[in-house]
Amino acid sequence: MDEERLLEDLKHVFPQRPEVAVGPGDDTAVIRLPGSDRLLLLTVDQVVGGVHVLPGEAPERIAEKLVRRNVSDIAAMGGRPAYAMLTVAGKPLSEEFLGAFHRGVQRACAEYGICVVGGDVSSLPEEGAVFTLSLLGFAEEGCVKLRRSARPGDLLCGTGCYGRSFESGHHLTFRPRLQEGVFLGKSPAVHAMMDVSDGLLKDARRMAMESGLALRFECEHIPLRAGASVEDALCDGEDYELICAVDPAGADALCSAFPNLSRMGCFVNGTPGSVSGIPALNKKGFDHFHENV
């Protein structure tokens, strides 16, 4: 079992209602609101002790990461966050830890205009900690970008730098590309978009697969974080940048208006999800059901 297969299974297990524009499989679900020109975006994400943060990490840092990685999903759809539900489960959970964690969540939410409207707290039978945030946001009709909408000839573009997120501390200090997501969502030149959490290669391949296309990387154009190799950039994950498929006819104007956007490859006709232009790799992108090295 891997994440991709599990997701495909879930698509068949859970039927969708007519108002669901996008169900399982993208950065957020998308719901049509009767009588409104806005779309409702829903996402949920976790921070698990020992998986997403090291044991003993400060509660404020955990809180910031939890909020920001959810905001990154909203950004990837071209929307803005609005309301959140918070769940905490752990053993042990001290009053001091919970107080610092909740204050950290509030500060992070306030930064992005999010109102926490409820949640739950529970113990665990064994030592550990799981923090979950469900986030609701909104996007304008026509500004939502799906990962499955890349077209042949589109350029693979991305914000920011890649690689060595854990070693550099970026996975705790990153800022979700919210304003960039709104900007890119409004551009007709952007056909598809998603955030990068499991590794640039794995997530870009997902976009190609969902779009029924192959992907050709131009690795010499991938912006590298300090000390990172091309392999690190392709495989490390936890970058929380945005990648998008851009119409080549509009790419120059888009990159001029948004200098932080780099061209890293292109989508082409071919076996869906196949990738060329990359070196031999020893690493793999992140998968919760496999050993990650």
Model-derived segments and spans:
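Active-site-proximal betaalpha loop/short-helix elements
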Residues: 92-93, 172-238, 268
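Small-aliphatic-rich amphipathic alpha-helix that forms the alpha element of a beta-alpha
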Residues: 59-83, 100-111, 179, 183, ...
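Acidic, Ser/Thr/Pro-rich beta/coil linker or hinge segments at domain junctions
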Residues: 255-293
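General beta-strand structural signal in soluble alpha/beta enzymes
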Residues: 21-23, 41-43, 115-119, 158-159, ...
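Helix N-cap motif at beta-to-alpha junctions
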Residues: 245-251
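Glycine-rich anion-binding loops of enzyme active sites
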Residues: 40, 47, 80-166, 266
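Extreme N-terminal cap/leader segments of soluble proteins
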Residues: 1-58, 77, 86, 103-108, ...
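Residue-level signal for inorganic ion chemistry
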Residues: 30, 70, 78, 116, ...
